[in-house]
Amino acid sequence: MIEKLDSIEKKYEELENLIGNPEIIADIARWQEYVKAHAELADIVAVYRDYKKVVKEIQDTIALMKEEPDEDLREMAQAELDELTEKKDNLENRLKMLLLPKDPNDEKNVILEIRAGTGGEEAALFAADLFRMYSRYAERQGWRTEILDANYTDIGGFKEVISLIEGKGVYSRMKFESGVHRVQRIPTTESGGRIHTSAATVAVLPEAEEVDVQIDPDDLRIDVFCSSGHGGQSVNTTQSAVRITHIPTGIVVSMQDEKSQHKNKEKAMKVLRARLLDRVQQEHQQKIASTRKSMVGTGDRSERIRTYNFPQNRVTDHRVGLTLHRLDSVLDGDLDEIIDTLILKGGQA
């Protein structure tokens, strides 16, 4: 690994020199190419330089401990060494992740779809909890979340919520979240205090640009209707809601969140493009899966991937066997430990 990182750092320094070369600057196309390549290596080089600095500090601390006769000072040095070792391990894990082969979709924004599954009203409330968890995670990452469409229940749950998450590397962090999420808790409506199990499904789709997916307008059937609100009551009398059916695949997208029919159509097309691209990629993944099974599961949307147990304050990811006893912080968007583990295991598959 060190050899590879040394080679990357050398390449980074070469690019740095080229970017400052007046001859290269004069050739704008070449200069832009080098700037882009330089930027792509910046993160891994910064982490590697931090890693080398920590390794040097560890070596210096060990040398100091060997020569230090004072026991109190040796104990202080040992505490510092423990701290540095933990820092080194964390940086090593980050480097392993940064060295993983890039997924062509990693830098894309995502369409996040959450649907209440088995469990009625409790499942809808859990779908709302999951949406909040991902929204809080997005905030922590400096990303932007926008609800594209939502089907609310009377007590604040979601039968379905579709959102767009935009930012740097969103898909790279979110791609392993697709699947069935299960919750075990005592519902607020349950007088007997019994634990109920319900579920919600999550689908994470890379946002597709028009160049990624070609859609023939003749393949679309577009219906317009009056949008309805909570409990089915009419929100407005104009036909602003849109339903688009992609005839060849049978994929249907309905959108009624906006008051403008044009905006609803635009959002529906965004979701349709993402679903069509996802369909193509799922078919491709299934072909690969027949020869290589991923260590983080099949990626099948019907696969149960995670359990959230409220009485035990526990969350378990079944694909990597990771259990954390801090469900409260996970639901508040503290997902990095789970996501990092999934990325590392997924990259080694």
Swiss-Prot record:
<dbReference type="InterPro" id="IPR050057">
    <property type="entry name" value="Prokaryotic/Mito_RF"/>
</dbReference>
<keyword id="KW-0648">Protein biosynthesis</keyword>
<dbReference type="Pfam" id="PF03462">
    <property type="entry name" value="PCRF"/>
</dbReference>
<feature type="modified residue" description="N5-methylglutamine">
    <location>
        <position position="233"/>
    </location>
</feature>
<keyword id="KW-0488">Methylation</keyword>
<protein>
    <recommendedName>
        <fullName>Peptide chain release factor 1</fullName>
    </recommendedName>
</protein>
<dbReference type="InterPro" id="IPR045853">
    <property type="entry name" value="Pep_chain_release_fac_I_sf"/>
</dbReference>
<dbReference type="InterPro" id="IPR004373">
    <property type="entry name" value="RF-1"/>
</dbReference>
<comment type="similarity">
    <text>Belongs to the prokaryotic/mitochondrial release factor family.</text>
</comment>
<dbReference type="InterPro" id="IPR000352">
    <property type="entry name" value="Pep_chain_release_fac_I"/>
</dbReference>
<dbReference type="GO" id="GO:0016149">
    <property type="term" value="F:translation release factor activity, codon specific"/>
</dbReference>
<keyword id="KW-0963">Cytoplasm</keyword>
<dbReference type="Pfam" id="PF00472">
    <property type="entry name" value="RF-1"/>
</dbReference>
<dbReference type="GO" id="GO:0005737">
    <property type="term" value="C:cytoplasm"/>
</dbReference>
<dbReference type="InterPro" id="IPR005139">
    <property type="entry name" value="PCRF"/>
</dbReference>
<comment type="function">
    <text>Peptide chain release factor 1 directs the termination of translation in response to the peptide chain termination codons UAG and UAA.</text>
</comment>
